[in-house]
């Protein structure tokens, strides 16, 4: 059998579906739209903490930059020669030794000429 309240041709309005001014009838709290303010102090504290953290990080980066500027770091634009003349002067300052001085070096050497050649990554066992 059909429900008599639904058999009419006009749409029925059930009390649960009534919405007044954007709020359902069931809403018992008239201040529900202001409930977001309930945790406003916690929200403000969180935002303030994030701002302090950002400021701290910014200060750390600034201190790192100042520390780099204080030390004598290699700066290519400042430390490398700028002109070909400077490069040529550096080449002229280099001394090419003759082979006789190399032979003297070998004769005066304290190294063992019979030692095995060193190969990195290979372990040698004393047998």
UniProtKB/Swiss-Prot annotation:
Pfam families xref list: PAM2
Q: Where is it localised?
A: Cytoplasm
Region Disordered, residue ranges = 1-24
UniProt-listed InterPro entries: PAIP2-like, PAM2_motif
Q: Where does the record place the region PABPC1-interacting motif-1 (PAM1)?
A: 22-75
**Biased composition, class Low complexity, residue ranges:** 1-15
Instruction: List every stretch annotated PABPC1-interacting motif-2 (PAM2).
Output: 105-120
Keyword flag Transmembrane helix: no
- Record text about domains: Only the PABPC1-interacting motif-1 (PAM1) interferes with the binding of PABPC1 to poly(A) RNA and translation initiation.
- Name the UniProt record assigns to this protein: Polyadenylate-binding protein-interacting protein 2
Q: Which organism is it from?
A: Gallus gallus
């Amino acid at each position: 059998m059909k429900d008599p309240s639904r058999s009419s041709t006009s749409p029925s309005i059930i009390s649960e579906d009534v919405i007044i001014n954007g709020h359902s009838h069931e809403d018992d709290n008239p201040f529900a739209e202001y409930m977001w303010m309930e945790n406003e102090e916690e929200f403000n504290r969180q935002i303030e903490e994030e701002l302090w953290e950002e400021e701290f990080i910014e200060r750390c980066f600034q201190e790192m930059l100042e520390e780099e500027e204080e030390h004598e770091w290699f700066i290519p634009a400042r430390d490398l020669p700028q002109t070909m003349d400077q490069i040529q002067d550096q080449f002229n300052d280099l001394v090419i030794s003759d082979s006789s001085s190399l032979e003297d070096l070998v004769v005066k050497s304290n190294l063992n000429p019979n030692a095995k050649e060193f190969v990195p990554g290979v372990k040698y066992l004393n047998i």
